[in-house]
């Protein structure tokens, strides 16, 4: 990948990540509280829906930038012809590697954010300090495996579907899709991926919110899923599915639309520069 492409992916990914995370933060808080083991109202209900936003604001840009730089770089390395039947596999591999890298940045900010969302009376820095003092660095990375195991299936669905929908729309209109069309494709792809991966999101939330030393805090995603199934059944596994779908559909529209528009703008700017 050339330098302009690298820079465009880096900046566009970061801008898209910050935009979507800050706009949709209240929906994410409601979803987290619905999935909390203490229950929606005890976790804060509709009060303080921006609790934990500093953690998200700090982590959004580097997290999204890391994902898209990796995603575009892996696609460039594999360099599959656009007409090839292997193209969806390329997108799957690129998205998977991108998630593994991005989660190194995402998980610490996610741990702090989710604890702040269910403890609205505690400040972000106070929660961050407590985690470091009581659990060390590993506390900030609690749920890394469950997050990766949630994000990879999500991206395996979302990104190939997004790329396929864009390709289909381009073929139907005989020209490359506009940024708003890429955003619409992102909304459909994101909403569908969100629905089918909700149980993994529930397990990830339970692991991150569990008390240190508890069996759930160990990070075993199958045990977390089994515990939810045993106590709450299917409704527990799909807790928060509608706000999650709403947030990620709208998020897909904003995130992938802003990314596509910003990257195209930066590449065009680079071509016009002397």
Curated annotation (Swiss-Prot):
PANTHER family: S-ADENOSYLMETHIONINE MITOCHONDRIAL CARRIER PROTEIN. This is Mitochondrial S-adenosylmethionine carrier protein. Belongs to the mitochondrial carrier (TC 2.A.29) family. It is a multi-pass membrane protein. It is found in: Mitochondrion inner membrane. One of its GO terms (biological process) is mitochondrial S-adenosyl-L-methionine transmembrane transport. The lineage of its organism: Eukaryota, Metazoa, Chordata, Craniata, Vertebrata. Keywords: Antiport, Membrane, Mitochondrion, Mitochondrion inner membrane, Repeat, S-adenosyl-L-methionine, Transmembrane, Transmembrane helix, Transport. InterPro entries: Mit_carrier (IPR002067), Mitochondrial_sb/sol_carrier (IPR018108), Mt_carrier_dom_sf (IPR023395). GO terms for cellular component: mitochondrial inner membrane. The keyword S-adenosyl-L-methionine applies. Mitochondrial S-adenosyl-L-methionine/S-adenosyl-L-homocysteine antiporter. Mediates the exchange of cytosolic S-adenosyl-L-methionine, the predominant methyl-group donor for macromolecule methylation processes, for mitochondrial S-adenosylhomocysteine(SAH), a by-product of methylation reactions. Its main location: mitochondrion. It holds the Pfam family Mito_carr. It comes from the Eukaryota.
